[in-house]
């Protein structure tokens, strides 16, 4: 009889690999992930089947972390104008807190990432719409949630490509002023 799988070990390995990937990006080989997790390539394959299987789980875990943190940032707060909430969220998403996710998922938006996570682009778009619609409802414009998301994503791609924080911050705050005054 084979050895029983130990889910707590698997989860510890996944957590360590996810931490590594968020800090350094997705590696081309297993060795850096194994070193970060304090294990061997063979044990990673034992627990996750294949390199791509491990990378898919790392991406899923990183995405769950991102959604948890950023959904809280953009959620409606009863005593705060929603544009203030969005301003604070932008600072976090475009700053050091969001940088690991921007680096990892920015690369995944390239065509090479699609085989690892089929449907990623759609998921990465649609999972933010509900909380943005709720917040924009306060401004009487829930239909603008798609526009807000498009502006955030576009400016994040711009920031990822150029590193021009000052210009992208100014553009986002100009956008907020426009929707606040609309």
Descriptions of predicted regions:
Residues 12, 16, 20-53, 57:
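Helix-turn-helix
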